[in-house]
From Swiss-Prot:
Localization of this protein: Cellular thylakoid membrane
Ranges that cross the membrane: 53-73, 84-104, 125-145
Gene name of the record: psaL
Family: Belongs to the PsaL family.
Keywords assigned: Membrane, Photosynthesis, Photosystem I, Thylakoid, Transmembrane, Transmembrane helix
Recorded GO CC terms: photosystem I reaction center; plasma membrane-derived thylakoid membrane
Entries under SUPFAM superfamilies matching the protein: Photosystem I reaction center subunit XI, PsaL (SSF81568)
Signal peptide: none
One BP annotation, GO: photosynthesis
NCBIfam families (alphabetical): PRK00704.1-3
Name the UniProt record assigns to this protein: Photosystem I reaction center subunit XI
Length: 159
């Protein structure tokens, strides 16, 4: 008869209960590993500036929406502009925090296998994040401002 412990779905990672990681059908699946491996934080072959640019574009794009719909100017005609200004202010704060982290963490110049683990690499990542996030915020603002045109294109009004 099969041992009931062999049929558990949640078990210690690699059979070692002291690693502090639970192996579940979700966290250990090939789909999850592939998905996480393709995120810009873990993708191989990206330079720090491109990694920061891609992460920044995503963050800048999704930061505008909450400010437009939930911010103090949500019921006014300038809600989109208020969302853009607030989003860029938050991007500036995040960029300052990333820069401060890099200054504190990478004081010694040591050769690292990952270029992101050096002061120069982290500085490039921070610059890429700022440019990407600002660009993403402006793209979101433009789409919100021209929503009628974009909606017309998507519904086939302009053929």
């Amino acid at each position: 008869m099969a041992d009931a412990r062999d049929m558990e779905l949640i078990k210690p990672y690699n059979g070692d209960p002291f690693t502090g990681h639970l192996s579940t059908p979700i966290s250990d699946s090939d789909f999850t590993r592939t998905f996480i491996g393709n995120l810009p934080a873990y993708r191989k072959g990206l330079s720090p500036i491109l990694r920061g640019l891609e992460i920044g574009m995503a963050h800048g794009y999704f930061l505008i929406g909450p400010w437009v719909k939930l911010g103090p100017l949500r019921d006014s005609d300038v809600a989109n502009l208020g969302g853009l200004i607030s989003g860029i202010a938050l991007i500036l704060i995040a960029t300052a925090c990333l820069a401060a982290y890099g200054i504190v963490s990478f004081q010694k110049e040591e050769a690292a296998a990952n270029p992101l683990n050096t002061a120069e690499g982290w500085s490039q990542f921070t610059a890429g994040f700022f440019v990407g996030a600002t660009g993403g915020a402006f793209v979101a603002f433009t789409l919100l401002e021209k929503f009628d045109v974009v909606d017309g294109i998507m519904t086939g009004l302009f053929n």
